[in-house]
Amino acid sequence: MNGAQALINTLVDGGVDVCFANPGTSEMHFVAALDAVPRMRGMLTLFEGVATGAADGYARIAGRPAAVLLHLGPGLGNGLANLHNARRARVPMVVVVGDHATYHKKYDAPLESDIDAVAGTVSGWVRRTEAAADVGADAEAAIAASRSGSQIATLILPADVCWSDGAHAAAGVPAQAAAAPVDVGPVAGVLRSGEPAMMLIGGDATRGPGLTAAARIVQATGARWLCETFPTCLERGAGIPAVERLAYFAEGAAAQLDGVKHLVLAGARSPVSFFAYPGMPSDLVPAGCEVHVLAEPGGAADALAALADEVAPGTVAPVAGASRPQLPTGDLTSVSAADVVGALLPERAIVVDESNTCGVLLPQATAGAPAHDWLTLTGGAIGYGIPAAVGAAVAAPDRPVLCLESDGSAMYTISGLWSQARENLDVTTVIYNNGAYDILRIELQRVGAGSDPGPKALDLLDISRPTMDFVKIAEGMGVPARRVTTCEEFADALRAAFAEPGPHLIDVVVPSLVG
């Protein structure tokens, strides 16, 4: 077989059977090889950022890597923002980047670039395959690397390596070694000391077993707990232990951590502010507080379970009760829009949240909704929501996916709607349309750039001129859509979208929070 066939066979034998792709000329042998390996599902995206974001969303729900196929350095560059988010989410991903034929690179053709350097900014593992005979082993190593430490593994494949014969698929990816047991004794001693303690959880600890263990610990010891501001996947809702998220703004996070003498990290990083602000500290750990690392992201749930058995034997974890807000009436606001979502969110839904300022009240409104998963913008690079919803829907076709998306962020990767329509994915996209970059209006004040901004400054934060017609945009990409301005219209549209399989978009008109 040729190199491309060996690559795809090795991927599917290693459990990587979905490939989100935006190919070019140097990847044509990979494209042709798809018909020879029917077990691989290839999905076309119109922009590389959709492919990388979809692979991120897929991994968060499936718990295993997807492949991404990109074209040369510029294609990799186009996908970089959502690769950054995936790196921060600590998800496994195999990125295949096609390159010029080995003998062609010396001619410095127009698309020639330093792919290795670009890949290194987001990848935990990078390798360039130099011969067809090495493709199988290199692909096997990429899969293993992506799963080890949940990271992005990038394999650079020259065109002549793809088309050359003499390649062989690898026998299979070795099983991942079990994590070494964690010594919970020191942290157990801290929690038993009686001094004010806070657990900050992240990684796999924000799913059922980790949440249950952490809730047992808190119940038994009197410690408090928070989860990361932007968790990779937070299981929440009725019947699941409820954890508050660390506040986004530094002032709020500092208030949550005030008085804490011991901060226990279970799969989370030590907290820092997202940006530097004049006169404010970047490190959010209170003065005099000692930081204790219980576990890294990949083994946090197991470490918490062991700690719970040590300090909370027999303790039952409290869980959130079932409750929903009443359906509101009248004009839509951020408050009432959140209540509509909370009142109608289906059981087992996957919520992809990039609602930004418009969604600040969503956590409260959905706290008692039927159990669901909540995916967030881990790396802060906007344009993640629509692509991640694509990947989540591919990973779990039997579950409804609700993408809560802000208008400005949506436009970064709006072509993901086309992929949703092409694959008939069960995704409902809610666009919060306030015609402004509200978060930047807020930050303009917070960074001290001016309490009375002028018209030129405000114009750069206004996206209402011209008004974006998301109904026409969505319909032009094959997604049924409607615009709503009242709570009643929003509720009707949401019910209809949840009742009918396939993609839908609802353009929700809400006022700006800051005028």
From Swiss-Prot:
Pathway: Amino-acid biosynthesis; L-isoleucine biosynthesis; L-isoleucine from 2-oxobutanoate: step 1/4; Amino-acid biosynthesis; L-valine biosynthesis; L-valine from pyruvate: step 1/4. Signal peptide: none annotated. This is Putative acetolactate synthase large subunit IlvX. Its EC number is 2.2.1.6. Residues 357-436 are annotated as: Thiamine pyrophosphate binding. Was identified as a high-confidence drug target. It comes from the Bacteria. Induction: The expression is high during the mid-exponential phase and low during the stationary phase. Thiamine diphosphate binds at residue 48.
